[in-house]
A protein has these predicted regions:
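Carboxylate-rich, polar loop motifs that coordinate divalent cations or form catalytic acidic clusters
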Residues: 1-157
Length: 157
């Protein structure tokens, strides 16, 4: 009986001391917050996407499109220097197999070439496809998605 009691006390002490020692270890993760104080145009992010170059693209509703390289923010929007996007109401982004970023805006989608960082118009096979694509580019677009085959899917109204 006494032996059982002593073993219980030693076990409790061992568990308590070992769990207390764990608090002294450094954290495995470095957590930081990306907000307006860090350089974001606003604190609301609609979508976050990482491209093939490693840049993180943050879609903000009202703040445009933000590119983050892990250290600095580069903001793109309506009237931006360098790249002027069609709107500041960015919904989401995706990348196709040709290293183009498809950006969904309320005013319609827009395509950016990630190599040149300039807006581009995707080439079309024939005039029917081009006419349909022009119609789609004028409609509200809330989501874009690139599947494994390289097809671009858009949710628009």
């Amino acid at each position: 009986m006494i032996r059982r009691y002593v073993l219980s006390i030693i076990s409790i002490l061992f568990i308590t001391l070992s769990s207390w020692a764990q608090g002294g270890l450094p954290s495995r993760y470095n957590v930081s917050y990306l907000n307006m104080a860090a350089g974001m145009p606003n604190n609301f992010a609609d979508d976050i996407f990482q491209d093939s170059y490693g840049f993180v693209w943050i879609s903000t509703h009202g703040g445009g499109l933000v590119r983050y390289d892990g250290f600095n923010f580069m903001n793109f929007g309506l009237g931006s220097v360098g790249i002027s996007l069609r709107s500041n109401s960015c919904r989401n982004t995706c990348e196709d197999h040709f290293k183009r970023l498809w950006v969904a805006f309320e005013e319609g989608p827009q395509v950016l070439d990630l190599k040149t960082m300039q807006p581009v118009v995707p080439p079309c096979e024939n005039s029917q496809v081009e006419a349909h694509l022009n119609k789609v580019f004028k409609n509200l677009c809330t989501r874009t998605y690139c599947d494994a085959k390289g097809n671009i899917w858009m949710l628009s109204f």
